[in-house]
């Protein structure tokens, strides 16, 4: 049975077109498909990505552990950086694409779309590494498009310029409209 995200009541007021996406109700369209596409390409579009699976991996050597599972060499990432990669099975077949957020060498947040990702990490985790599925505890909005930074800049006192906040990085000290965000 599909779950509602924290943003469902607001979205429900905007659309009656829903689909099950990884166990969560997600709007299939809010206004018009072409209009939404253009907004994302030309201005900005806000999307509920709560359904993406978030997994925290922590303990001594967490980064090295994750590096042995994803296709990208995430060992080269510094704290605050994000890497895009893939998970493959033992035959090299792609299971899922993912992002890996490095908080420290011992604290990693993984984001993918599939429940199998969490189970894979759990199954392969060596002693001392904890794997915690945190999807339900982490509502996830994604603002995408060329005007995204300008729109958010008016809602925070943090510098969100490309120079101060480069692409594929994250910070945990940012508030948007007074709400802490990750």
Question: What are the roles of these predicted feature ranges?
Answer:
Residues 1-88, 93-95:
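Acidic, proline/glycine-enriched N-terminal capping motif
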Residues 96-182:
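Acidic, low-complexity central loop/insert segments
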């Amino acid at each position: 049975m599909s779950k509602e995200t924290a943003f469902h009541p607001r979205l429900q007021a905007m659309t009656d077109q829903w689909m099950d996406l990884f166990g969560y109700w997600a709007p299939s369209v809010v206004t018009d498909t072409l209009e939404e596409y253009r907004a994302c390409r030309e201005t900005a579009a806000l999307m509920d990505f709560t359904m993406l699976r978030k997994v925290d991996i922590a303990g001594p050597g967490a980064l090295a552990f994750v590096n042995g599972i994803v296709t990208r060499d995430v060992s080269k990432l510094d704290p605050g950086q994000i890497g895009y990669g893939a998970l493959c099975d033992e035959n090299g077949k792609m299971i899922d694409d993912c992002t890996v957020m490095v908080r420290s060498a011992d604290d990693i947040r993984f984001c993918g779309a599939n429940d199998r990702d969490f189970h894979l990490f759990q199954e392969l985790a060596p002693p001392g590494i904890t794997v915690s599925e945190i999807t339900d505890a982490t509502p996830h909005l994604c603002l995408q498009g060329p005007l995204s930074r300008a729109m958010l800049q008016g809602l925070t006192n943090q510098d969100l310029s490309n120079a101060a906040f480069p692409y594929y990085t994250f910070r945990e000290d940012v508030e948007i409209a007074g709400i802490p965000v990750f």
